[in-house]
Amino acid sequence: MSSRVHKVVLAYSGGLDTSIIVPWLKQNYGNPEVICYCANIGQDDELSGLEAKAIATGASKCYVEDLREEFVRDFLFPLLQSGAVYERTYLLGTSVARPLIARRQAEIALQEGADALAHGCTGKGNDQVRFELTYMAFAPHLKVIAPWREWNIRSREDALDYAAEHNVPVTATLKSIYSRDRNIWHMSHEGGILEDPWQEPEEAMYTLTTAPEAAPDEPEYVTVGFDQGVPVSVNGERLGPVDLLLALNNIGAKHGIGRVDLVENRLVGMKSHGVYETPGGTILRVAHQGLEQLALDRDTLHYKDVIAHRYAELVYYGQWYTPLREALDAFVRVTQRNVTGEARLKLYKGNAMLVGRRAAKSLYNPDIASFTMSDSYNQKDAEGFIKIFGLPVKVQALLEGR
């Protein structure tokens, strides 16, 4: 299983798994120096006391970096512009975060002169792929240690026993039945009752959003402004990326916006059942789509939907740092040049309804589209168009003797 390493940088969250990995690495890899790395991408109170906790478990130091601005600006907003959604509903909150975390972890490892990288991803999940593909892109020569593919710990009970045996301070209990991942974009829930896809999740599971039934009885209107596809304002107030997303999270959560229940196809071959809460991201997606309806011509809009599907797969599969993603981003950037304007949404009991949109360079022309008589569109022209457009249908019918 193991071979001696001298210094390892661990992707660290402070949860049960990564807490016990610190002494496990020392025990199984020749007592190396263990450096913990944690990226602040919007976990909030989960980061409280993290450095002290890492040291208490045996780490020599712990980096905690605030990457929220970069995460929103360089990852979430390009994702939004692309229109990527995995398997029709998942807004990719966990998937898109891993490349940034793993890249900075690898950069810290190179800076520290480490000879190994470690993560706490299970051998059944997608995250192991996302982390390790990023390691390959930025530190291909470093050894990768994935304890869940090596150790004999097979359950939460085993992990808690190991923590107690090695005096690792943890707050987890057997009552903590859900596996969660949180960042500024979303909260994910797996495990527990969700392992039966027929069972409705209990309301107590949700941590970000109000139940639609308990949401305000009056709708709330919110206007989101965009500049070339990038969100820049909420209700007329210009905000930076982080503040803008936080504002929309608060507004959306209050109205129960952004709950998704999904049985998804994991990259590693199995299906899994998860529930996601993405209040601000859902508002942004609906608003952005509404503005694109005005700004994009038919062919570009339709082909962009094709790109969005592949972009979603690329993000889900951990292929962020690839030429394909850069090439698709170049295409998306061109499509966003005229996506400047505002979209207005009506939020009510779990629904985010587009009720208005206006663009600086809108392709919608009311003089042409109106049902009233207009000199801008000669309806007689449609006759010749239909004859040409329908010619293949007519020829096929004649061939078959109809």
Swiss-Prot record:
GO CC term, one of those recorded: cytoplasm
Database matches in SUPFAM superfamilies: Adenine nucleotide alpha hydrolases-like, Argininosuccinate synthetase, C-terminal domain
GO molecular function, one term: argininosuccinate synthase activity
Pfam families, A to Z: Arginosuc_syn_C (PF20979), Arginosuc_synth (PF00764)
Binding site for L-aspartate: T122, N126, D127
Binding site residues for ATP: A11, Y12, S13, G14, G15, L16, D17, T18, S19, A39, G120
Positions that bind L-citrulline: Y90, S95, N126, R130, S179, S188, E264, Y276
Record has Nucleus as a keyword: no
GO biological processes: argininosuccinate metabolic process; L-arginine biosynthetic process; urea cycle
PROSITE patterns the UniProt entry points to: ARGININOSUCCIN_SYN_1, ARGININOSUCCIN_SYN_2
Keyword Cytoplasm in record: yes
EC number: 6.3.4.5
Coiled-coil spans in chain: none
Keywords of this entry: Amino-acid biosynthesis, Arginine biosynthesis, ATP-binding, Cytoplasm, Ligase, Nucleotide-binding
Catalytic activity: L-citrulline + L-aspartate + ATP = 2-(N(omega)-L-arginino)succinate + AMP + diphosphate + H(+)
Pathway the protein acts in: Amino-acid biosynthesis; L-arginine biosynthesis; L-arginine from L-ornithine and carbamoyl phosphate: step 2/3
Compartment list: Cytoplasm
PANTHER family registered for this protein in UniProt: ARGININOSUCCINATE SYNTHASE
Family in the record: Belongs to the argininosuccinate synthase family. Type 1 subfamily.
NCBIfam families documented for this protein: argG, PRK00509.1
Subunit field text: Homotetramer.
Official protein name in the record: Argininosuccinate synthase
